[in-house]
Regions:
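Aromatic-rich, lipid-facing transmembrane alpha helices and their immediate juxtamembrane interface loops
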Residues: 1-147
């Protein structure tokens, strides 16, 4: 049933897996942000909020990639071009978002332990290189396997 649904509506497994992978990453990288010492309720709320935002960014990147390549099944097809675009879109947004939120709106701050390049955290950039590729690999191997 899941496999059939994932073929008809590939956004569902993309969104679910994106949220789960990003939530894990957000909690693991939490010590690299200045608010890490705050109370548990705050950390849960903010990290899950970020994971939800990350999932929406991935869904947007999936949608744009699907429009450009005229197929919502590009994950199953395993072509390299759509996957590279998918990752590049998320990475481009992340670069802008990290810069804007740490330099302009001051929505969050890095701890001194966060490695940075030009004021942008390297760990969030690594997140947007690793997670979309991992998501694509998992969905190709698991969700789209023929029954």
């Amino acid at each position: 049933m899941f496999r059939g649904l994932s073929r008809r509506l590939p956004e569902l497994p993309v969104a679910g897996l994106a949220f789960g992978l990003n939530a894990a990453w957000e909690f693991l990288q939490s010590p690299l942000y200045s608010d890490h010492g705050r109370e548990l309720g705050y950390l849960l709320r903010t990290r899950l909020h970020c994971a939800g935002g990350d999932a929406l960014i991935l869904l947007f990147a999936f949608g744009v990639t699907s429009l450009i390549f005229r197929s919502r099944q590009w994950l199953r097809d395993g072509r390299r071009g759509p996957t590279v675009l998918f990752v590049a879109l998320g990475l481009a947004y992340t670069i802008w978002s990290e810069w804007f939120n740490t330099q302009v709106s001051l929505s969050w701050q890095y701890a001194e332990s966060m490695p940075q390049v030009f004021g942008i955290g390297l760990i969030p950039l690594a997140q947007w290189l690793a997670i979309p590729f991992l998501l694509a690999l998992i969905l190709r191997k698991c969700a789209f396997e023929p029954t």
